[in-house]
Amino acid sequence: MNIAVLGAGAWGTALAICLSARHRVTLWTRNVEHLAELAALRTNQRYLPRQPLPDSIHLVSALSEALERAELVFVVVPVAGLRTTLQQMVALNPSLPLILACKGFETGSAKLPCQVVEEVYPASITCGVLSGPSFAREVAQGLPAALTLASHDEIFARSVAGEIRTASLRVYSGNDVIGVEVGGALKNVIAIAAGISDGIAFGNNARAALITRGLAEITRLGMALGGCRETFTGLTGIGDLILTCTGNLSRNRRVGMMLAAGRQLAEILPEIGHVTEGVYTVREAYGLGQRLQIDMPVTQAVYSILYEQVPVEIAIQDMLDREPGAETD
């Protein structure tokens, strides 16, 4: 199969490497300088250093060239640039099947990636979302991982899941597109909180409590938006949440740890050098929670630290001072 992967960040590069084992892959980046580096070094020194890029992967910077022979497209651009990329794509080929592999809410509209597709593409478009616990470096290295591919077209989801699985990558299929995307977006917010907790050395008990109560927030918001409860106990819910809140490769957890050390966001983000979606997702998630009247104390605490300049210690104390209710509320 001819597959185009749009976005040459860490995750896009890892997917391209993984998919190239069974398919003809074209990797697209709009950055001409980055393309030249990829071609010269055959590694993504900016985002996935020391990981060889197979010679079979075709590199392009023209979107028209990336889509020319593609039978399937993986869209792996940051959510901030998703709508613009989709608008360019639909003008070139409005019927090419899409797989969204980006996580977050669109800034300003609070739309999920699948909802942005619905606004840009004809209703007939075949679209799926790919998510789950997966650090890019480990996937690129061929270490075992499991993901979920969800689509309203369940036949399409099963077909693509079978096409992209490898000896080390297990891909399940499903139909809860909203639930999968909410889990993938909000886990980054909870991971910032977990990083703050770890940075302050609150210990394992506190981290476990944060993950568990964070999952409750994800589930409440996800169900309010139309997701299924069962999804949040699966790979794209608790699975992705555990990984992002505990793994040392988690950029969002790292942001939290640096905040706990007294660092300012303005200096943290350039140092990390990658898009850290949780920083932007928390604004939209907090706004959604307010509008839908959903209790989201962990999200609120992260929002207050990042955007209301509330000191970390005060935000934590405010959480601890909350009157506990029934666990299942």
UniProtKB/Swiss-Prot annotation:
Main localization, broad class: cytoplasm
Stored SUPFAM superfamilies: 6-phosphogluconate dehydrogenase C-terminal domain-like (SSF48179), NAD(P)-binding Rossmann-fold domains (SSF51735)
A GO molecular-function descriptor: glycerol-3-phosphate dehydrogenase [NAD(P)+] activity
Pathway: Membrane lipid metabolism; glycerophospholipid metabolism
GO biological process: carbohydrate metabolic process; glycerol-3-phosphate biosynthetic process; glycerol-3-phosphate catabolic process; glycerophospholipid metabolic process; phospholipid biosynthetic process
Annotated catalysed reactions: sn-glycerol 3-phosphate + NAD(+) = dihydroxyacetone phosphate + NADH + H(+); sn-glycerol 3-phosphate + NADP(+) = dihydroxyacetone phosphate + NADPH + H(+)
Keyword annotations of the record: Cytoplasm, Lipid biosynthesis, Lipid metabolism, NAD, NADP, Nucleotide-binding, Oxidoreductase, Phospholipid biosynthesis, Phospholipid metabolism
HAMAP family named in the record: NAD_Glyc3P_dehydrog (MF_00394)
PANTHER family for the chain: GLYCEROL-3-PHOSPHATE DEHYDROGENASE (PTHR11728), GLYCEROL-3-PHOSPHATE DEHYDROGENASE [NAD(+)] 2, CHLOROPLASTIC (PTHR11728:SF1)
NCBIfam families named in the record: PRK00094.1-2, PRK00094.1-4
Function: Catalyzes the reduction of the glycolytic intermediate dihydroxyacetone phosphate (DHAP) to sn-glycerol 3-phosphate (G3P), the key precursor for phospholipid synthesis.
Protein name: Glycerol-3-phosphate dehydrogenase [NAD(P)+]
